[in-house]
Amino acid sequence: MRLYELSFAQIEDFFYKLAEVKDIIKDSGLMEFLPELKKLDSTIQTGTTRVKHAFPIFQKGGVVMDITNVQQAQIAEEAGAVAVMVLDKLPYDVRKSGGVARMADPKIIGEVMNSITIPVMAKVRIGHYYEAKLLEALGVDMIDESEVLTPADEEHHINKWEFSVPFVNGARNLGEALRRTVEGASMIRTKGEAGTGNVSEAVKHMKIINSEIRSLISMSEEDRVKKAREYQVPYQLVELTAKIKRLPIVNFAAGGIATPADAALMMWLGADGLFVGSGIFKSQDPDERAKAVVLAAACWEYPEIVLEAQKMISEQKSMMGIDIKSLKPEELLQVRGL
């Protein structure tokens, strides 16, 4: 059976069961006595393509929170975040401070890794191969090649196939999402407009991606070939996307999510999970807001629970948002890395 004949849910279920079996074998002590299993365990650690694409599946339905220090990382873990993303500055502060935004201090990333048990991700500049190599050597669980940081290469993204660690990339539309997939990304996130506390761009980008996938489904083979040329991706990837009626890799929402209602909205629109940046730790109630956003993301199908999550926070303590229309074209982060 070919991969594209399986549903995304079947693939997801397979990886969950595979992880459960591996844990049972390790807990039983059989790994030491069965050389082939031990060899398999060692192979799994090297970051094969299957493992890199499976890792984001385990984050589905959850919230990844941007943090800058150990204290924030611990708040995120306590709130139920599935992972943290380490930055030097939160996106709101990156936007306000200007200058060149780079990878976070490896010492801080290491301290965060040693202080929590959930996965730790970190951002690199678009096209900055060596920042990514440093994070791989450091042992982070995932790398975000992010438009929030100042691009190192205005023309090209990193070739992610050369790495053992999975990557996440931003996208505003289906063409961008599929190009990043061809480059080796294991996860896509809507770009939105980071650091604004304004979810409108994330909504727009998610709707564009969904709409373009629906268009693919109804297209003739000839039109899909033309679309593959337009997107600059292999036809087989376009065909696969139409076949499974979604992106072939996990698609999270990001950019401007600041409240439990925002979180539930993006999940309702079809996001597999969420990245929440400045919305948590630029608010005046980060502990409560972190828990509320996680609850809303997990229970988005139940408005009464999302309502309780919304009651956990105070709108008066939300971060000061930025109207997208007030930003100059050169101030938009989403246009970086097409």
From Swiss-Prot:
Disulfide bonds: none annotated. InterPro entries: Aldolase_TIM (IPR013785), PdxS/SNZ (IPR001852), PdxS/SNZ_N (IPR033755), RibuloseP-bd_barrel (IPR011060). One of its GO terms (biological process) is amino acid metabolic process. Pathway: Cofactor biosynthesis; pyridoxal 5'-phosphate biosynthesis. The keyword Isomerase does not apply. Catalyzes the formation of pyridoxal 5'-phosphate from ribose 5-phosphate (RBP), glyceraldehyde 3-phosphate (G3P) and ammonia. The ammonia is provided by the PdxT subunit. Can also use ribulose 5-phosphate and dihydroxyacetone phosphate as substrates, resulting from enzyme-catalyzed isomerization of RBP and G3P, respectively. Belongs to the PdxS/SNZ family. This is Pyridoxal 5'-phosphate synthase subunit PdxS. It comes from Saccharolobus islandicus (strain Y.N.15.51 / Yellowstone #2).
